UniProtKB/Swiss-Prot annotation:
Enzyme class: lyase
Species in which this protein is naturally found: Hahella chejuensis (strain KCTC 2396)
Any Gene Ontology biological process: L-histidine biosynthetic process
Name under which the protein is recorded: Imidazoleglycerol-phosphate dehydratase
GO MF annotations in UniProt: imidazoleglycerol-phosphate dehydratase activity
Superkingdom of source: Bacteria
HAMAP family associated with the record: HisB (MF_00076)
């Protein structure tokens, strides 16, 4: 089996980001993004998705975290697409429900080649520490556009915003793991009746 690894670098006037991933890893991760709460969430994706990740980012955090968070989503999406290659043999679809105390979220993903995001999370507050919860949408939109996936995110219940988004990221990691897994019965076969994704 060919290694499903990738390294992507993104350099703009706003951010400089390097992302290395191994889709068939063990969940080892290192993050230096300058946005601690995002690091915490990305760690959930790595651990629950069993994806090795190494992301280093320098952004215009003196303005705010918007560009950094969005561009990390973009770069991670590009890295996943690059590591995945032609998509032959993958399960393609993934889904997961994850609880954390009172919070429960569902994430469903399709490596369809058609970017689309449906994110429905009614946060109970606008900030988690110093992190603006609006930026989670920007992260996932960046990922979706560049990984070329359809992604449905629903927080079904929750009172604590930290718990709400942590269940989302854990479920995202587990849905990724399921969708990216190689199906031995589909070896070398495109998971689409069209013959292309």
């Amino acid at each position: 089996m060919a290694e499903r690894k990738a390294e992507v670098t993104r350099n703009t006037l706003e951010t400089q980001i390097t992302c290395k991933i191994n889709l068939d890893g063990s969940g080892q991760a290192r993050f230096e993004t300058g946005v601690p709460f995002l690091d915490h969430m990305l760690d959930q994706v790595a651990r629950h998705g069993l994806i090795d990740m190494d992301i280093v980012a320098k952004g215009d955090l003196h303005i705010d975290a918007h560009h950094t968070v969005e561009d990390i989503g973009i770069t991670l999406g590009q890295a996943v697409a690059k590591a995945l290659g032609d998509k032959k043999g993958i399960r393609r679809y993934g889904h997961s429900y994850v609880p954390l105390d009172e919070a429960l979220s569902r994430v469903v993903i399709d490596f369809s080649g058609r970017p689309g995001l449906e994110m429905h999370v009614e946060f109970t507050r606008s900030m988690i520490g110093q992190f603006d919860v609006d930026l989670f949408y920007e992260f996932f939109q960046g990922f979706v556009n560049h990984a070329q996936v359809t992604l449905h995110i629903d927080n079904l219940r929750g009172r604590n915003s930290h718990h709400q988004i942590e269940t989302v990221f854990k479920a995202f990691g587990r849905a990724l793991r399921m969708a990216l897994e190689l199906d031995p019965r589909m070896a070398g076969i495109m998971p689409s009746t069209k013959g292309a994704l």
